[in-house]
Amino acid sequence: MAQRMTTQLLLLLVWVAVVGEAQTRIAWARTELLNVCMNAKHHKEKPGPEDKLHEQCRPWRKNACCSTNTSQEAHKDVSYLYRFNWNHCGEMAPACKRHFIQDTCLYECSPNLGPWIQQVDQSWRKERVLNVPLCKEDCEQWWEDCRTSYTCKSNWHKGWNWTSGFNKCAVGAACQPFHFYFPTPTVLCNEIWTHSYKVSNYSRGSGRCIQMWFDPAQGNPNEEVARFYAAAMSGAGPWAAWPFLLSLALMLLWLLS
C-alpha cells in the first residue's frame, strides 16, 4: 500500500513539473519574443500608437516601434537615418524604390520581429534581425519591380565608399542591372541585407510568413506569424498538447496501479 502511494506521488510530481515547464516556456515566448522593439539606432524602447506615421509606414500606426519623424525620413533619399543613397547607380525606378521604403518601414516600425532578433556587436546597433521568413510574393514582386534599376553590389550592408558622407560605389564596382547582381528573387531578398530575410515557401495570408505589405483595416497579419514562431521556438508550438497527453497517461497508470 505504501509503495503504491509513493508511486502515485512520484507520478503526480512528474505531471506538475512537466506542465509547469510548458507554462514557463509559453510565458517566456510571450514576454521576450512578442510585441518588442529592436535595440537599434532609431527604434523606440517599446511599441505603441503613432497616429501620424508617414505614407508607407502608416500600416503600423496602431502599434509601432518607429516615431513619426523616423517614418518621414524613411521616405527620403540620403536621409539622416543611415545616409543611404538609393540612387548610387543613377535614378532608381519609383516602383523599385517603394519596396525599399517598405522594407525600411518594416524594419523600423514592426513590433512583430522578435523571434528573429539577434544580438550584434556593432557601433550603430546592438540587435539585428536574421532570417525573417519573408512571404514569397513580396520578394518576387520586389525583384520584378527592380529589374530596370541599377546597382553595383549584391550586399548593401558593406563595401561602400562613405568618404562623401553617403554611400557611393567602390572603385572597380561596376553599375549593372539588378538582375546581374541578383539573378533570382531569392538572391535579392536573402543577400541584400546579409540574410536579414530568408524567402519563405509560404504565401501571404498563410500565417507562416512575414508580409512586408498589408492592409491595416484587416489587422496586422504579422502578429499571428510572430506568435506561431515564438511558440515554436519556446517548445510550445505544435507540441503544446503533449503535457496533457502525458498527464492522461500518468493518470491511467495511476488508476491501473
UniProtKB/Swiss-Prot annotation:
Q: What tissues contain this protein?
A: Primarily expressed in tissues of epithelial origin. Expression is increased in malignant tissues. Expressed in kidney, lung and cerebellum. Detected in placenta and thymus epithelium.
Q: Which residues form the propeptide?
A: 235-257
Tell me where in or outside the cell this protein is found: Cell membrane; Apical cell membrane; Basolateral cell membrane; Secreted
Q: What is the effect of changing W162A?
A: Moderately reduced affinity for folate
- Residues reported to bind folate: D103, Y107, W124, R125, K126, E127, R128, H157, K158, G159, W160, N161, W162, S196
Primary site of residence:
membrane
Please give the InterPro entries that the UniProt record associates with this protein.
Folate_rcpt, Folate_rcpt-like
Q: List the disulfide bonds.
A: C37-C65, C57-C105, C66-C109, C89-C175, C96-C146, C135-C209, C139-C189, C152-C169
Membrane topology per the record?
Answer: Lipid-anchor; GPI-anchor; GPI-like-anchor
Impact reported for R125A? Moderately reduced affinity for folate
Explain what the record says happens when changing H157A: Moderately reduced affinity for folate
Instruction: Give me the Gene Ontology terms describing cellular component.
Output: apical plasma membrane; basolateral plasma membrane; brush border membrane; cell surface; clathrin-coated vesicle; endoplasmic reticulum membrane; endoplasmic reticulum-Golgi intermediate compartment membrane; endosome
* One biological process term in Gene Ontology: pharyngeal arch artery morphogenesis
Per the record, lipidation of type GPI-anchor amidated serine is found at S234
Range of residues in the leader sequence: 1-24
This chain's protein is named Folate receptor alpha
Name the gene behind this protein.
FOLR1
